Amino acid sequence: IHLIGRSFKYHRPRGIMTCGSEEPNAIVQVGNDTSLTEPNTRATEIELYEGLEASSQNCWPSVNFDIGAINNFLNKFFPAGFYYKTFMWPKSFWYKIYEPFIRKAAGFGVASAKHDKERYEHKYEYCDLLITGSGPSGLASAYAAAKNGARVILAEDKSRFGGSLLTSEVSIGNQNGKDWADNIITELKEMPNVIVKNRAQVFGYYDHNMLVMSERINDHLPKSKKYSPKQRLWYIRAKEVVISSGSIERPLVFGNNDTPGVILSSAAKEYLKVYGVLVGRNPLIFTNN
């Protein structure tokens, strides 16, 4: 799959560039007209399940043949802020012509008009140590603190624990990195003083070590198995915090680096190592060194 959607202003083609929550291009609509839909969802964060429906956004009549793509050829007439001086005259055109046109062009996905029947929860928790990320440093920190009796919360944004260990060839303690991570997670889950959460994103860090975490509980399950709340919002007060969320590869700047077929090397490696997906057979690798 190369063409996922279209960009906001010029309707340029967009494909998958990353393999996680940092995805800027592959934005889709989840659901259909007969159910509750969720706009502006990153395709790289959606786990496949039976009955999943997703569609491209910001394109008409289809993503392959998008009328709005003409904006890309007329880009010289649409510089930044062009609307502040273009739609000034005549004044009588504003409410009936200009404003409806601008409002129709604005936005990205389509907000659902249906009532959200899903259940949502919130929870308050306290811990001695909150750790974001389950890579080698996060797991080592959680294990050491838990062994010393500390109350630990380990949060991992993705569905699988291990972080960089999932794509590397390193060994830890005479074990393969992935096996070491699996063993540590198994031990942590058995400890009564440890809370281990995957699909949980810590997105807010406030005064006095108050952190907010969003846990996706049943987003990855088919409708027939969605008995639990859809999401849970955690308010966590921590004595200490370890941020071990890893790094994000910085894309290099060159012409048309926003189009389908351009993907970060770290993402290509993760798709191959974790999901068994080959992103291409004849790649051109561009590095900065």
Regions of interest found by a model, annotated:
Residues 1-289:
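Residues forming the flavin
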